[in-house]
Design a protein with these regions (language model features):
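Helix-to-loop junction immediately C-terminal to a conserved catalytic motif
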Residues: 13-47
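Non-catalytic C-terminal accessory region of glycerolipid acyltransferases
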Residues: 4, 101-209
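Helix-enriched interaction subdomains in cytosolic or periplasmic regions
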Residues: 1-16
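Short, glycine/polar-rich helix-capping loops at beta-to-alpha or helix-loop-helix junctions
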Residues: 9, 75-79, 159
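Catalytic core of membrane glycerolipid acyltransferases/transacylases, capturing the structured
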Residues: 35-96
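A generic structural signal for alpha->beta connector loops
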Residues: 22, 62-64, 86, 112, ...
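A generic local structural motif
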Residues: 23-31, 53-54, 102-104, 135
Length: 209
């Protein structure tokens, strides 16, 4: 991501986001993880809307965040492609078996950026809950030796009622069980984070009552 372009976006978009992306930020443990990201990290979240990236860009204002973006969004039109390139987005084709995007994500982390991944892989339909997580974010965080920051957004953009919940940062290696195979560990850790994000959603919904 071009840091000058990132800051240009944040400065020019700061006032508009106060209205459309207005939100309340909730912390699981503010001492462990707050809105300031002190080291490169993998941010994961449920997926509600194309504006999810925007809300995290302004929530973690100090960080340079590069999102993982599906081909249907990245290639939507020339303007979108231009923005995605300058925001440092990594394109992934969900219908192919090309995993080179993971190397690109690791490179982003190695150069001091944070990355944003939506492990559901797509935006759920209205009648669907949180979709099963895909494990690519675990491989990336493990290889780059960076923490994962689980988050949740209610996605009620434009209403002023959005809630963003920030969980504690977690290192993948801290969740490994030496008695299990690599595949078993990855599956268990993926389910762990899926359930963690669900709990963040419960916190967000409880806060709305």
């Amino acid at each position: 991501m071009s840091k000058p372009f990132s800051w240009f976006t944040k400065i020019t978009g700061f006032i508009p986001q106060l209205f459309y992306l207005r939100r309340k930020t909730i912390y699981v443990n503010k001492e462990i993880q707050n809105r300031k990201i002190k080291e490169p990290a993998v941010i994961i979240s449920n997926h509600t809307d194309l504006f999810d990236f925007g809300v995290y860009m302004f929530t973690f204002f100090n960080a340079t965040i590069c999102p993982l973006v599906a081909e249907i969004t990245y290639d939507k039109n020339k303007i979108m492609t231009f923005l995605m390139k300058h925001w440092g987005a990594v394109r992934v084709d969900r219908d192919s078996y090309d995993f080179s995007f993971m190397s690109e994500l690791i490179e982003k982390l190695d150069t001091g950026n944070s990355i944003l991944i939506f492990p559901e892989g797509r935006i759920p339909e209205k009648d669907e809950g949180l979709l099963p997580f895909k494990p690519s974010f675990i491989y990336v965080a493990k290889e780059a030796n960076v923490p994962i920051i689980p988050t949740y957004t209610t996605g009620e953009y434009g209403s002023g009622k959005t809630r963003v919940v920030i969980g504690e940062k977690i290192y993948v290696n801290d969740l490994y069980d030496k008695n299990l195979s690599e595949k078993e560990n990855i599956n268990n850790i993926c389910l762990y984070f899926e359930n963690y994000v669900k709990k963040l959603g419960e916190i967000a919904n409880e806060e709305k009552k």
